[in-house]
Amino acid sequence: IIVDKKTVKVSEDGYFVFGLDRDRKFDVTITKTLNGKKEIFTKKVLKRKYRIQRIDGLPENKVTPPESVYKRIREENNKIGEARAINSNLPFFKDQFIMPVEGIISGVYGSQRILNGKPKWPHYGIDIAAKKGTMIKSSASGIVTMAEDDLYYTGGTIIMDHGHGISTIYSHLQSVMVSVGDKINQGDIIGTVGSTGRSTGPCLLYTSDAADEV
């Protein structure tokens, strides 16, 4: 399978998955080659309007971090990137994912945040507001690829690999209850809701990510 010009991993039973860039402006071309026969499919990508969200009153060092923490942020971003880039053969990406916690959706995917009047990168997950200490479930079975207590932006953070480049990220946790390499079943408790990192209140920032993005 080739999506646009990118080869995408296919499972033994014929499943594949890829993600679309938030701001993609053109259709997707999928090329399937089987036993020497090539088929080409075109899928339409619809334009979407995103919410603009303004948040004021944040500590200035969380909006524009001081130069003294640039190295830390860069190192943490590299570790996150490595965990998100894992493209294993785990089969759990095909499962029906569940919500990791019950609560109010206070931030939506794709929204543009303006923090203290300064436009920032778009939001690539959803914020689920819940009481501090609320138990968080794994939304699907998988293997823990990152478990950190105190990242600069996302605080307590867990990343889980579900196979074929699909990962889930759980951020702003009060407590992290798993370790790298742990094999987790869907619904297992992995941590608790907190307000760590750059957060305006107790919530879970929940992100589903695809390593194969076009």
Question: What are the functions of these language-model segments?
Answer:
Residues 206-214:
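Conserved small/polar residues in nucleotide/adenosyl-binding loops
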Residues 188-195, 200, 208:
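Extended, charge-rich intrinsically disordered regulatory tails
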Residues 21-22, 35, 133, 149-151, ...:
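Short polar/acidic secondary-structure junctions
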Residues 30, 105, 142, 187, ...:
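Terminal peptide-recognition signature
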Residues 135-146, 178-193:
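Short, well-structured beta-strand-loop connectors
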Residues 139-177, 202-204:
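Zn2+-dependent peptidoglycan hydrolase active-site motif and core
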Residues 42-154:
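Surface-exposed, glycine-biased beta-strand/turn segments
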